[in-house]
Amino acid sequence: MFGKRKDSKNKAMRDNEELTPWERQQLLREENIEKKQKKSKKILVSSNLVKFNGLRKRRLQKRVITLASIFGISAIISLYAILPVSRVSNIEIEGTDSQTKTAIIEASQVKKNESLFAVVPTKFLIRQRIKNDVATVKDVNISLKKNVVKFKVTEYDIVGYIQRKNTYYKLTSNGRELNVGQKATNGNYPLFLDFKKKTLLHEAAQQVGEMPKKVRFGISEIHSSPTKVNPKRVRLVMNDGNEVIGSIDTLATKMSYYPSMAKALGKKGVIDLEVGAYAYPYBK
């Protein structure tokens, strides 16, 4: 075996000896190039391996950081959820009376000791429930201060009351009726009486809402007094002792003439605004 290797080596040496100097130089050059290529491949493979290991390490670190962050945030939320500060401690309402406050709390469905996580994401729905269920609320702003829920209310004008049995319900300028009643009226608002149809009641309330406040506050009672000719006929009892006959659909416009007509009448009487406008004293 060793003899064969020696013979091969001797043969290669003899072959080299038979080459010209230029050919030997070319052969050496090719051998050097081949060695450099092999070395370059080794370096490239080694470099790629280092890059792959580095990329793998960075991905692993990123995954560990992500998981740690998720677990950390979950732990903080879980801890916060069991603390008293995460629950509603109080409910404050600004811009309305005690009766409407009760209605707002009921409509909001927000309760003391309820989790704030149930309140914050549903603020829009709470606002819509209040506006839909509480007739006097025109708009409501909901905010949180620490763990106190605050409602800042903007209301429609109150234009009067409707009596049902022994309970009085507020009527608003948009023609709606508050669903929470009270045992007595308050404020200088007229009482709506004898209205059998809610559509006429709400239309009358809207008309009163369009009147100047000075005229509106001069009305004591508004009676539905329909006839076959005019189902929208109403009779108004004024605080100054006069009576006004009118029609719901033109009430706001024609009542603007009332102050000057009452002054021209000179004594207590009836001002008829149903068709045209004229007045006569009671003793006529």
Swiss-Prot record:
UniProt GO BP: FtsZ-dependent cytokinesis
UniProt domain POTRA: residue ranges: 86-156
Stretches assigned to coiled coil: none
Keywords: Cell cycle, Cell division, Cell membrane, Membrane, Transmembrane, Transmembrane helix
Transmembrane residue ranges: 64-84
Subcellular location: Cell membrane
Gene Ontology annotations for the cellular component aspect, listed alphabetically: cell division site; plasma membrane
Domain of life of the source: Bacteria
Pfam family, any one: FtsQ_DivIB_C
Spans within the Extracellular topological domain: 85-284
Residue segments, region Disordered: 1-21
Residue intervals on the Cytoplasmic side: 1-63
PROSITE patterns: POTRA
InterPro entries documented for this protein: Cell_div_FtsQ/DivIB_C, DivIB, FtsQ_DivIB, POTRA
Its membrane topology: Single-pass type II membrane protein
Disulphide linkage map: none
Predominant localisation class: membrane
Function: Cell division protein that may be involved in stabilizing or promoting the assembly of the division complex.
Family membership: Belongs to the FtsQ/DivIB family. DivIB subfamily.
UniProt name for this protein: Cell division protein DivIB
Gene that encodes it: divIB
